[in-house]
């Protein structure tokens, strides 16, 4: 089945709209543009699709309301602008969706909300309940309390995380660009447009400029990485221009617009997906070659004897990263021991744990049922 048909058949969509598509060149909200987005999403709802909207624009609206001509550099001022602007963003979306008799809900999330298992499940339950009630959730990062997301702004990642959270069928990232090219078309006249590819392939990241490039910072690279993340849960991604007329309706009808990135695998188990979606891990363990082989090829649990080093501070039950000697992450899992305990039993046989600690919580540092390979 063609990817376009898969998108057309998708029941649950996450739509991410960038700041340039909802603001007047960064100076306050463009209510006419938001009205068009509301109309398009209303049409999707009428066609039987569930839609979650991830929208930027709060800081731009806050600056307008506060009378600031230039974007401030101080984090606390950006946070203040976000707090003021979030009111306007919610008001405009509410009024425009009301024209179509659709209720909206404002949901502000942080990475911490999705890293904590209980809060993650609560957020998931709330969003699924809203969708079942016919409500369109409007999601944004809680910029008022988060600093890194303002500094490096990345609602593309948030869109992917939300897609995984609600087990969405597809992520649609709308931007002011047509999609992905083999090179920067502004600099390379030979750049070719990529209409379809498999998400997560290394070539895509190179096309987008690679990590740390001038092209990639806050640009296409974040979208490529978001597609890679969404693909882990079996969701396909479309990167398309929000300037295209009726782009959502046309995509939903199966029309080929933008770059279509196919998920290579089926949906992952929910708990393992949650572990992969951790953006900030508090600890990691370095494994010897034998442990790496047993995890990746043998499907075994991680035993303390295979750990050569414990880095960071973490508690029992937290998600930790498992890396090889070169620092390459090979797996993630829920640890049965704290970092302090892990340091004591590292390089020890499981039979020695009780002699070292005085007790045994488990024979494994990470059981294979609580382990996900990357």
Curated annotation (Swiss-Prot):
Q: In which pathway does it act?
A: Amino-acid biosynthesis; L-proline biosynthesis; L-glutamate 5-semialdehyde from L-glutamate: step 1/2
Q: What is its EC number?
A: 2.7.2.11
Provide the protein's localization.
Cytoplasm
InterPro entries assigned to the protein according to its UniProt record, in alphabetical order: AceGlu_kinase-like_sf (IPR036393), Asp/Glu/Uridylate_kinase (IPR001048), G5K_ProB (IPR041739), Glu/AcGlu_kinase (IPR001057), Glu_5kinase (IPR011529), Glu_5kinase/COase_Synthase (IPR005715), Glutamate_5-kinase_CS (IPR019797), PUA (IPR002478)
One Pfam family here: PUA
Question: Keywords assigned by UniProt?
Answer: Amino-acid biosynthesis, ATP-binding, Cytoplasm, Kinase, Nucleotide-binding, Proline biosynthesis, Transferase
Q: Which GO terms describe its biological process?
A: L-proline biosynthetic process
- Swiss-Prot/TrEMBL catalytic activity: L-glutamate + ATP = L-glutamyl 5-phosphate + ADP
Q: Record's Gene3D superfamilies?
A: Acetylglutamate kinase-like, PUA domain
Molecular-function annotations in GO: ATP binding; glutamate 5-kinase activity; RNA binding
**Chain residues that bind substrate:** 56, 143, 155
Task: Tell me the ranges covered by the PUA domain, including all copies.
Answer: 282-360
Positions with a binding annotation for ATP: 16, 175-176
Indicate whether Zinc-finger appears among the record's keywords: no
**One Gene Ontology cellular component annotation held by this UniProt entry:** cytosol
User: What role does this protein play?
Assistant: Catalyzes the transfer of a phosphate group to glutamate to form L-glutamate 5-phosphate.
PANTHER family attached to this UniProt entry? GLUTAMATE 5-KINASE, ISOPENTENYL PHOSPHATE KINASE
HAMAP family assigned: ProB
Family per similarity comment: Belongs to the glutamate 5-kinase family.
Can you name this protein?
A: Glutamate 5-kinase
What organism is the protein native to?
Ralstonia pickettii (strain 12J)
